[in-house]
Amino acid sequence: MNQHNLIKLTESPRDAQQGLPYVITPEKRAAYINALMKVGFDVIDFGSFVSPKAIPQMAEAGRVLSMVDKTGSKSKLMAIVGNLRGGSDAATQPKLDIIGFPYSTSETFLKKNINADAQQAEAIIDGLQQICAGNGKELRIFLSLAFGNPYNDAWDIDILSKHTEKLALKGITTVTLAD
């Protein structure tokens, strides 16, 4: 492995935009993504395929993607999904390379973020693996609350390791440790 493969940079305008108190138009979001495509990030986490009722800032993700120009860029595009419907919608997007899913060792996090318990979340991961395999997409799991748990659920490095191992045994090749 050479030095250029040691660090991969992911830029995430999605993370910032979804917390804004207003909605940025799809045209402006696409223009921003197009500017980022020229920078050379390894991955751009551009948006989410979720209900616009849940996160109105991420509405019309497919429309945003339709306006993104990948010509001459090595950057991969990633979207986050919270369920199988979002995964199915994302998988139909030809410009999308990676589908991300927020998983956690915390039952409270899972309930608040994807309205699922651990068993349901694992079933979603299984379904997303099939969706991704059938559509030529990479699946990336975000192991949220990897560095601690503000909800007072049990957390330690052994619990984190157990969940990471479980994901690896499922065949997940990319796990991002997230706060």
PLM feature segments, named:
Residues L139, L160-D179:
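Conserved C-terminal portion of the radical SAM core fold
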Residues M1-P21, F101-N113, G134-Y151:
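N-terminal small/glycine-rich loop or linker at the start of catalytic domains
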Residues M1-L84:
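N-terminal capping/small domains of soluble enzymes
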Residues V23-A30, M78-S88, N113-L128, A154-S161:
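Glycine-rich anion/phosphate-binding loops
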Residues G40, T92-I99, L169-T173:
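Glycine-enriched alpha-helix->loop->beta-strand junction motifs that scaffold or abut catalytic
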Residues A54-A79, Q120-I141, S161-E165:
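Alpha-helix-loop-beta-strand connector modules within alpha/beta enzyme cores
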Residues D42-M67, F101-A116, F147-Y151, T176-D179:
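Glycine-rich, proline-tolerant flexible connector loops at the mouths of alpha/beta enzymes
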Residues A16, L36, A90, I99, ...:
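Conserved, mostly hydrophobic/aromatic
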